[in-house]
Structure formats: structure tokens, C-alpha cells
A protein has these predicted regions:
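Fungal secretory targeting signals
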Residues: 1-23
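Generic alpha-helix initiation/capping and coil-helix boundary signal
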Residues: 7-8, 16-17, 131, 190, ...
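Short, charged, amphipathic alpha-helices and their helix-cap/turn boundaries
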Residues: 138-156, 197-199, 203
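CBM-like carbohydrate-recognition segments
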Residues: 22-134, 148-153, 165-169, 284-379
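Short gly/ser/thr-rich secondary-structure transition/capping motifs
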Residues: 157, 221, 347-349
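Extended ligand-binding clefts on enzyme/binding-domain cores
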Residues: 165-288, 293-304, 316-345, 357, ...
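Active-site-adjacent "subsite" loops/lids of carbohydrate-active enzymes
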Residues: 157-159, 164-165
Length: 379
């Protein structure tokens, strides 16, 4: 939990709140194993792989996540530690087009970078210290983001490669990678990267947030989505949460006190605005503040995960009653085969997943929620 005197403001609203007792019933290990197996099976796009890798890290190897302990992590790991994460990241790097700077060449700027944290972890903990394949792949991905990808005139990196277009999704994909790179690099170069990650969050907020406290999904470019898409708001809040966790656990945390306060406030804006629209059974709607939208378990799960993480870091328990309801809703929305039901189709944004079709990112969000809840209970 944040302790530095300059960061007391982060938890100021929690001063009158005692930590609540657990009100959510924990999802069983057997169910989580099924959810995980299904996630691995259907995660094929770059952002799905990156999100799945983050979910595996937070759930199975929490001490190696940006929420789990000091950064950088140990350079030498016990045999078998994070083997599933390392093997998947290795597979991506081995399959990388040698003529591409991005880890996967799929037309997006932000999405391939979502795999970057796991590639950096693989490089940091590699047993063959002469192997520079992973450091090269990560450096090329960073170079593409910072030096080649299109930007707005004030410096916001585009989420798309073919035109300048800002998506809320970007904050989960690229800034956490930039920040993690900085935390591992350290020194003045690392500090610059951590500040770059923060600055991207700041710029995106300026473009996407409106007076409701919620974020629009997509702005600029040849088309826009000005609705308050639940998953978009969840991506943004969760991405900023990862950047905050990275800064907080880095050796440079004391040099970025204001940035940590800002990020905490910006995350709280989204979760506070979102839970105002929670429905009686615990769900949020796909378009959060639109009564004619439909229930979406995906965004509900990720926003709940963020809220547990925020409570663990700051001691602010003001939304725990809401996220406990959300956790129970997610538990009841996972079927006997480990599939999360009642999700939005992640590629249309505006329609439910069809019968027999499931959301890869939704599967990951269940694991991220479960990991965040376990960490919250432990703290």
C-alpha cells in the first residue's frame, strides 16, 4: 500500500472507511482452470495474446507482476517459474517477421505492444545471457511506438497505423509496455520512459474523457465511436492501473510522486463514474450509461479487477460493495465448461457474442478479476 507522506492524498477519501469484510464468494480453482484453458485455446489476435499473458502473470506468478513486488524482478527464477508465460512469449518472438519492428504485424500500433511486457520478462530472466533475441524484439517494438507510429500534433501515439486515431483500448496495450521497459532500464533513460507512459495516459484522457467522467471509445480518424463503451473504459482504467503499479514498484517511484497521484485520480474517475450505472444484479451495460444497451460481463469483470487493485493500493474501499456484487455476477456467468457468458462481441463493440461464440479477452478478464480479488483479500 502507498505509504509516502506526499501520497496521502491518494487514499484521503478512504479515511472514514474501515476495510470491509469479504462479501464475494470465491470462484473455485477448478472453474478458474477451465477458464484459463479456454482463454489459451481461443486467444489468437495480438491484443488477446498480450492480455492472456498478463492474466497468467497476475494469477499464477503474482510476485512477477507489476502489482506484486519491487521492479526489476529477480534476474534468475527457480526452475519452472512463469514457464507458461515465457514459452508463449518465446513462441511469438520466434514467429516474428524479421522485416517487422512490431512483435506481430497486424495493422495496429498499440495491440502488438501488449505482448511486450512478457517479452521483456522473458529477456530479463533468460538463462542464456548471450541470447539477445528478446531484447532486440522488445527494442524494435519500442522504437516503432516512439519513433515511427503516427501521432497527433501534441504527441498522442495513434492506436492505428494507417491513420491517426485514438482508441481507449490503447492504454492497456502500449503504456504498460513503455513503463515496464523504463522500470527495467532504470536511470535517466528509464525515468524518461516512465514519464512517456504517464504522458500518453494524460494525452489520451484529454482526448477521450468527457464531463461524465467516462471515456469515449474512439476519436479522430475517418470514423469515431463516441459512446461510453464499457470495455473501452475498462481498458483505459486497467492500463493506467498497470502504469501506476509499475511506477510505484520501480526504483524511480520517489521521483514520480505527482504522476502517481494523477494516475490514481484518473483511474478513480472512471471507476466512480462506471459503478453509478451498475444494475441490480451486479452487471454493467455494454454502453455504460445507455439504458437501451445490454448487459456485458466482460467490461464488468475488468472494471471490477481495476477497482480491487485500486483498493489494494490506496486503501479506498468506497466501491467494494459494488465490485463484490460484480464478482458474484461474474462467478454466476461462467458456465460449467469454463466459458464466460453474456459478453459483448469484442470485434463489433455493439452486439452481444453470438450463441456458441466466446470472448477471448472476456476469459482473460475473469482471471484478472480473480487475481485482483485474491490480492485484495491478502492485503
Amino acid at each position: 500500500m502507498i505509504q509516502h507522506p506526499a501520497l496521502i492524498l491518494l487514499a484521503s477519501w478512504a479515511a472514514t472507511c474501515a476495510a470491509p469484510t469479504a462479501a464475494a464468494s470465491i470462484i473455485s480453482d477448478a472453474t478458474i482452470d477451465k477458464v484459463k484453458s479456454n482463454m489459451i485455446q481461443i486467444s489468437t489476435h495480438s491484443w488477446e495474446i498480450g492480455t492472456a499473458l498478463e492474466a497468467l502473470t497476475e494469477l499464477e506468478w503474482p510476485s512477477l507482476s507489476v502489482f506484486g513486488g519491487p521492479l526489476p524482478p529477480p534476474a534468475k527464477l527457480p526452475s519452472g517459474t512463469a514457464s507458461d508465460v515465457i514459452e508463449w512469449a518465446t513462441k511469438v518472438v520466434k514467429a516474428k517477421d524479421p522485416n517487422s519492428l512490431t512483435l506481430i504485424d497486424d495493422g495496429a500500433v498499440g495491440d502488438p505492444a501488449s505482448i511486450g511486457v512478457s517479452v521483456l520478462l522473458t529477456n530479463w530472466t533468460r538463462t542464456n545471457r548471450n541470447d539477445d533475441e528478446f531484447s532486440t524484439a522488445a527494442a524494435q517494438q519500442l522504437t516503432y511506438l516512439l519513433d515511427i507510429a503516427p501521432r497527433t500534433s501534441d504527441g498522442a501515439i495513434s492506436h492505428r497505423a494507417e491513420e491517426v486515431q485514438l482508441w481507449a483500448d490503447f492504454l492497456y496495450m502500449a503504456p504498460p509496455f513503455i513503463a515496464y521497459y523504463g522500470a527495467l532500464e532504470g536511470g535517466s533513460g528509464g525515468l524518461n520512459l516512465l514519464r512517456t507512459a504517464y504522458q500518453q495516459c494524460k494525452l489520451y484522457r484529454q482526448y477521450l474523457r468527457d464531463s461524465s467522467g467516462l471515456w469515449k471509445h474512439i476519436v479522430l480518424g475517418s470514423w469515431q465511436d463516441n459512446h461510453h463503451w464499457g470495455t473501452g473504459n475498462a481498458w483505459a482504467a486497467a492500463g493506467m492501473m498497470r502504469v501506476l503499479g509499475t511506477i510505484h514498484h520501480s526504483k524511480l517511484a520517489s521521483e514520480m510522486l505527482k504522476e502517481q497521484i494523477d494516475l490514481t485520480s484518473w483511474i478513480n474517475e472512471i471507476v466512480s463514474a462506471s459503478w453509478k450505472y451498475q444494475h441490480a444484479n451486479g452487471t454493467l451495460f455494454n454502453y455504460i450509461d445507455e439504458s437501451d444497451s445490454f448487459a456485458d460481463s466482460s467490461s464488468t469483470a475488468l472494471l471490477a479487477a481495476v477497482t480491487y487493485r485500486l483498493a489494494s493500493l490506496t486503501g479506498d474501499y468506497s466501491h467494494i460493495w459494488a465490485v463484490d456484487k460484480a464478482y458474484n455476477l461474474i462467478k454466476s456467468s461462467v458456465d460449467s465448461n469454463g466459458w464466460l457468458l453474456n459478453t459483448v462481441d469484442p470485434e463489433t463493440f455493439s452486439t452481444p457474442s453470438q450463441s456458441g461464440s466466446y470472448s477471448p479477452e472476456g476469459q482473460s478478464f475473469v482471471l484478472l478479476l480473480h487475481a485482483a480479488y485474491l490480492d485484495y483479500l491478502a492485503k
